[in-house]
Each structure stands twice: as C-alpha cells, then as structure tokens.
Amino acid sequence: MVWNGAQLVGGLPLIHSQKYGVKLLQQPRNDWCNAGELMVHSAVEVQPVVAAIVQGLATFSESVLCFDGVRFETEPWTTFIKEVEAVSGQMGILRREKVGLIEVGDDWDAYFQSLSGNHRSSVRRAEKKARKSAELSLLRLQDLSNDDRVTWMNRAFEIENRSWKRDAGTSILASEGMPSFFLDEAEIARTSGMLELWFLMLDQEPIAFEYCHLAKQVLLSYKIGFDESFKHLAPGKLLRKLQLETLCRQSPGTVLDTKGILCSEKAKWATSTYDIGRLVVALKGRIPKLVLSAYLHAKPIVQRFRNVESHSPSLGSAGAN
C-alpha cells in the first residue's frame, strides 16, 4: 500500500505462494475468480504511486512476480511496465487475449443496425420463434433483499445445472464449495449496491440468466447460463438482445464488459475490445531472473507441443483412413 500522509493513494494486493519450488508473489485468486488490481487513487498522479509500489516489490528479491488478467492499456499498468524497465527488471507478457465491450448508447436502432446483417437476421428469427411459442420477457433484478439474493442466485445455479456443464462436472452445483463462494460474493456485491441479476423468462419461468456487478456505469458479466432443453430457442442470444435493449432504455451510457476470452458469439455484439494477459516480472535477484528466462523460453515450446497433440489424429482414426 502507498500512503500520502494519512491518505491511502495506491496499492497492489498480493499473496506469497510457491510452484515447482519457485517463490511467487501473485494476486489472490482461486479457480473461479481472479482478484487484486493495481490501484491508484483518481485524485493523485499515477507515476509516483506506481514507482513506490515497484520500489516496494523490489525488496522481495527471491520472488518472481506473476500478474494475471492485466489490462495492459490502462495507465497504471503501462506506468508499471515503464517503472520495471527503469530499475532494469526483466519481464514477459504471456497469454494475451481480447475481451469484448458492448456500448449501446441511447439509440437502440443505431446500435442494432451497426451489427452484421447475418447476426441481425439471426436475432430477429430467434425472437420471432420464441414469441410464437410462449410469452417472452426479461427480468432485471437490482436492490435485492438478502433473502431474494439467495433465492434468485439458487435459481441461477439450477438453470446452469440444466446445461452441458452438469455432465462435464463444471457447473456451480457440481463443484464443491462453489455455491457458497458465489453466494458470499453476491452478498458483498449486494451490500455495495453492485449486484444485478438478469433472467430470460418464458411464460414467467426463468430459462437463462446472467450474474453481473454494476459499478461506475460498467456492467461486468461474471456468469451466464441457460437451460439446455430450450437450446432450440437460442436463449443466450435472446437474453443478450433484450438486456442491451433494456440498458439502452433504462441506463443509457452503460457499458457491458463481457469478461473472459472474446469468443465468436460475444464478438458479434461487441463494439470494442481490450487486451488482457499474464505479466511475469523478476525485479531483483539472480535466481528469479534465471527462472523467468527459462519460463519465457519453455512456455512457447510447451504450448506448441500441446497444440500438436490436440490436432494430431488418434491411432484409431489414422487406421480407419
């Protein structure tokens, strides 16, 4: 943490860990959530705060620093990279990926017309088909009571458990500890006024959901799912369409951050993207710099080997041909 007198002006939450005998400093996280961000108070200059953070990190001379989900174009992180270079630190950027942003503005027709013709036609067909079969509506839940939070989060869990994720063992209800984690996280968001739940309703019954946090006019999408038995109605597509229409009407100026890797379905709605990735740093010490150098050289080789394995035909298919 960085203080200016009695005022906290910046920080970077990290935890000590160890992997393959290598000492690491990294953001707190688990398999369901990345946490920890490079923070600088909006009322102060970025460079001195970040320089102080880098100076403090340099005291951990035996550790490699590993940051996931870094949004590289933001001023704190671009400054962080410059400060690492200034102290002759070594670093590497890995797993660079794109994340989609959707900014509808206050003119739904203009936004919808900006999408590809094929996508617009697909959305219209899906909505027409769904409305022919039943009553279609969208439920936006904000300012929930504690009891309602539990009720509706559990409804979301049940919907997801009726998808392919249940058989894969990756749904929330199929993962030990995951329901309580998301319920606790939702409670933190609720008490901070940030919790939003969206449900696609068919004849007043929810068939798809999106679990979001809203802060500073950015709606962050953390979990989305739908009941597999309604797959023929394209519930994910309809949820997104009705959600964006609602945001345009009720909350103009809100930006939807789709989080996660930009897949083809997200890209069809996106108006812009940003890059995230892993930043690995060795500031001081011979051993961390040697470890980082070895890691940066080995990672592409391992990745190429995995790609070859994943694209190689099996012996059975080779014999059949």
Q: PLM features: residue spans?
A:
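A conserved beta-strand-loop-helix scaffold within acyl/acetyltransferase catalytic domains
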Residues: M1-N30, C66-H232, G319-N321
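Acyl-donor binding region in acyl/amide transferases
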Residues: S17-R95, H213-D275, V280
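A structural detector for beta-sheet-dominated domains
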Residues: H41, E103-G105, A282
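A general structural signal for short secondary-structure boundary/capping elements
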Residues: L57-F60, L115, S145, Q204, ...
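Residue-level detector of flexible, active-site-proximal loop/helix-junction positions
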Residues: S145, C263, L283-R286
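Short alpha-helix boundary/capping motifs
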Residues: D184, D275, S293-Y295
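C-terminal structured domain segments across diverse proteins
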Residues: E187-L200, E205, F209-C212, L239-L247, ...
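Membrane-proximal basic amphipathic "stem/tether" segments
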Residues: V280-N321
